[in-house]
Amino acid sequence: MSETITVNCPTCGKTVVWGEVSPFRPFCSKRCQLIDLGEWAAEEKRIPSSGDLSESDDWSEEQK
């Protein structure tokens, strides 16, 4: 007994079967996958942060 898992495409909301029949999962198509990638590249999407500076923020490629 195998239960079919479905998810919604994050870009368009279309139902997508989670399995080998959907090579672009969780996206429904290559188009939706590229739209999402473009949103990340344009910084329309980002992972939230606390905004606190860490030690690495003070690093510079220039040596003092």
UniProtKB/Swiss-Prot annotation:
Molecular function via GO: DNA topoisomerase type II (double strand cut, ATP-hydrolyzing) inhibitor activity; zinc ion binding
GO biological process: regulation of DNA-templated transcription
SUPFAM superfamilies the record matches: Glucocorticoid receptor-like (DNA-binding domain) (SSF57716)
Natural source organism: Citrobacter koseri (strain ATCC BAA-895 / CDC 4225-83 / SGSC4696)
Top-rank lineage group of the source organism: Bacteria
Disulfide bonds: none
Note describing how the cofactor binds: Binds 1 zinc ion.
Homology family: Belongs to the DNA gyrase inhibitor YacG family.
Entries under PANTHER family matching the protein: DNA GYRASE INHIBITOR YACG
Bias (Acidic residues) ranges: 54-64
Disordered: region residues: 45-64
Cofactor: Zn(2+)
Residues binding Zn(2+): 9, 12, 28, 32
Name of the protein described by the UniProt record: DNA gyrase inhibitor YacG
